[in-house]
Structures are given as C-alpha cells and as structure tokens.
Amino acid sequence: MIISGKELSAKLKAEMAARVATFPEKYGRVPHLVVILVGEDPASVSYVTGKAKASEVVGIKNTTIRKPADITETELLDLIRELNSDDTVDGILVQLPLPEHISEAKVIETIAKEKDVDGFHPLNVAALWQKQECVLPCTPKGIIRMLKAAGVEIKGKRAVVIGRSNIVGLPVSKLLLDENATVTVAHSRTADLAELTRQAEILVVAIGRPKFVTADMVSDGAVVIDVGVNRDPETGKLCGDVDFAAIEPKASVITPVPGGVGPMTICCLMENTIECFMKNRK
C-alpha cells in the first residue's frame, strides 16, 4: 500500500479551508503566516512557493519577506523581533538553511515561542520531551498523521528511525514513543545497521542519502516512511532515502518521493499556523 501524502493533505486542507472560512465572522480576520526567505537558494524558493500556495488553498494570509543573502544577522533578528510584536502576525517561519554568517540557533531562539509554527524553539522542543502542550514540528507530526490515516497500529511495534536530526529524527522518535512504540534511533555510526533495520516493523528514514536503504535491509511487511528528498545521481530525478522500486513489493505500507511526506509537512504547517492563531486569541 502506497500512502499518498498528496491525497491526504488535499483532504485535510479542504477541511481546514472550511474551518478558516468561518474565522472572519468569528474573529474578525484569518490567520496570518509570515515567511522570511534569505537569499535565492532554488530549493528554498521552491519550498517557500509551496507554502504560499498551500496558504491560499486553506485561506490563510501569507506574507513572504525576501531578504538578500548578505543581510546581517542583526538586521534579520531585528526583523523577527518586529514581527514578534505585531499582533496581526500569528506565525513566523524563517526558511532554512541560512547563509553561514547567520546563526540558525539565534534565529530560532528569537522567534516568539507562541509564533513558532515550525516547532523549533527551544521551549517548544523542551515541552515536546516533557509531554507538555506545544507546537509540534511539521514533518514528524505529518508522519504520525500518515501512519494513523493508513491504519497502522503503532502501539507495541518495533520502530527504527535512521537519522538523529533535531528537525526530524529525534522528534519523530519521541512522537513514536508517545504512541507506545519501542523505538531505536540509528545513525551514521550505528554498527550492523542492516541487521537492525530488518527488525523494524516501522522504519523511518531521514538521512538525505539517495536510495541508501536497499531491499535487503527491510523485512517483509514492514511499514516504510521515506523522509529524504534527493536527486538520483543516475537519472537526475527526485528520489528518497530508500530504493522505492525494490522495497515497495516487500513493504505493507510505504511513502513515495515525491508526493509522500513532503505535502504532509506543508499541511501540518498550515495546521500549526491555525493552532497559533487560536492560542493567541485566548
């Protein structure tokens, strides 16, 4: 079974659009997301465009602020502080990666916790690990939504997450733990990785290496979630971190690239923007 993130996200966005349509009468306005793009990295431009299109579908106001790659760190932090104090702005997202002269950690810390739609602020991260209410990071949240939509029973399953980034690997391992899976986090220094992945009933791969996971690394009937977005060195086409063509016949459930986790990440960003809007109304 292939889980289409495109189809699931379209359904969820339609539901959100119906809800947001009632907001002007209820609250006087719709949620407002501000996206800051520094420089002209083609991948970043593409991601920002995707977020603007999704906002339009859902009915969220989207403002994209473009800044040159040579903007100073101080100028960028001052801009974020301005947006923090603007009551008409509900969500702030700074598209990563940033130029080397700007500290991503400082940028993330400067965004107000209440407007951190990415769920990257240290206080939101701490709340996640302490099982407190918080804004969940978009990709891990989208992965759990996809598993549930596909009817995958997470409780009691052996889950292996390859990748330990703060953006995907670590938070998705925590969300799987919260769903009562038994979770192992693997990484570049893991010994006997294939032996470990073959034990996985749920395998999440987020390492950014094209077709790294091969068919012999996956057990029959496994659920495979592919977070990677890469260029296939042979064809130049988009591909994931797993060899989809070889693994799809073995897997009980698998996500494609493109059209899998990516659309759900943007969908959950829309959800988080609405969530921040609602919390800030109280």
Protein language model features and the residues they cover:
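Positively charged, low-complexity intrinsically disordered leader regions
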Residues: 1-27
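Short beta-strand segments enriched in small/hydrophobic residues
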Residues: 31-39
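Short, well-structured alpha-helical segments in soluble
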Residues: 75-87
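Rossmann-fold NAD(P)-binding glycine/threonine-rich loop
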Residues: 104-121, 125, 228-281
